Every structure is written in structure tokens, then in C-alpha cells.
From Swiss-Prot:
Organism per entry: Bartonella quintana (strain Toulouse) (Rochalimaea quintana)
Pfam families linked to this entry: Ribosomal_L36
Gene Ontology cellular component list: ribonucleoprotein complex; ribosome
GO MF annotation: an example: structural constituent of ribosome
Biological processes annotated in GO: translation
Keyword Ribosomal protein (UniProt): yes
Entry protein name: Large ribosomal subunit protein bL36
Family membership: Belongs to the bacterial ribosomal protein bL36 family.
Keywords: Ribonucleoprotein, Ribosomal protein
Amino acid sequence: MKIKNSLKALRERHRNNRMVRRKGRVYILNKTNPRFRARQG
């Protein structure tokens, strides 16, 4: 999982990316291609 300051560019890298907020953190999740996962931090 990558940790990035800005997730907007990462979200657009794959069409199945989903932006999710959990416990005050923002994640990008991708079930079809998990290598695109990221967390904002």
C-alpha cells in the first residue's frame, strides 16, 4: 500500500479505484487490481 499526501491523481490511474473514508483516513481501494491501493497520510 502506498502512502501519499494527495490521492486525486492516484484515483484516476485505474477505472475501478474507489475512494473510501475509514476511521478518519482516506483510502483508495481496488478489488480487481489490488496494487493500486493507497492511503492518505
